[in-house]
Amino acid sequence: WERTKNWNFGVDLELFHMFYMNLEYYTRRSNAVITVDLPFEYGINDMKRNGGIIYNRGIEYTLSFTPVQKRDFSLNINLNASKNWNKGGETTIDRTTGMYLTGSNTQILKEGYPLSGFWSYSFAGLDGSNGKPMFNYVEVPEEEKSKGIDPTTYLVYSGEKEPYFTGGLGLSFRYKSLSLNTSFSLLLGSKKRLTSPYNDFRGEHNMMPDPTKNINRDLLNRWQKTGDEAYTNIPGLPIWPLGIAWTLPNTETAESPIYMWEKSDAMVVSASFLRCRNIGLSWQMKKEWCDKIHAKNLSINFNMDNVFVIASKRFNGFDPELENSIMPRSFSLGLNIGF
């Protein structure tokens, strides 16, 4: 059973018919229900059980401000935002290196860390002789390797997958029969792992590019000769034995140096962004003009969606929300006539 304790505090405030605010603060404590894998001999793949304590707290608020409200001119500003914190308490689940690398939104990985936190291999640069990626903390003497070693002793914390702050801003401006509306969104605090330029090579012989397929343009900046390691962190085409597996300090096995590089902090990027989601402009024809064309009303409107986004340059033009594609910009022009 999952047990949850909540505490909420809220305030609604309105002043002079110009300013409105809604503010809510909450805390929540729950004993998490998690899914755990079971051995084959149990006859089922997994089961639900209590796996630890989760602490959540956050603040959400909405502000609306109308500094000017006249017959021919008005301005309205709307702001909504939320900031959330969570962390895991004690947990009883067994955690693997893969779980730390992937992260989780439902399981506690490490006490005191956010629920959506994830970890990475610590990238130490490229080998100048062959472009092979190197890593900190993973090479230890064989006699010191043990199944009981905590993976976070050789991994580094990379941040949260979920944002700790989200916000939206809306502006409405009217002058006589002309109206302008805009909306913005802001997301702060989340981290993402970039898609590997070697991702399309999966399944190819020796992980070398297939001449019949396109390849990621980031590979133009890969290591190609001695000295390139000073300017790039993208490994060279793997000429070292691909079958080589890296035995980690806790005796788990990493697939290959390329895989470890893909899961390293070299591939972690800030996913914070500011986006202008919409700009809308409309014009309403005066009633006396409408009468001349025997119409009750007439309006023309123009809208632009996904106007721009400001995000990390490491996305190389891709959208920080979609990762591997681009959110298209769209335009619309409309004419409304009522008779």
Predicted feature locations:
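C-terminal beta-signal and terminal closure region of outer-membrane beta-barrel proteins
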Residues: 51-56, 101-130, 205, 219, ...
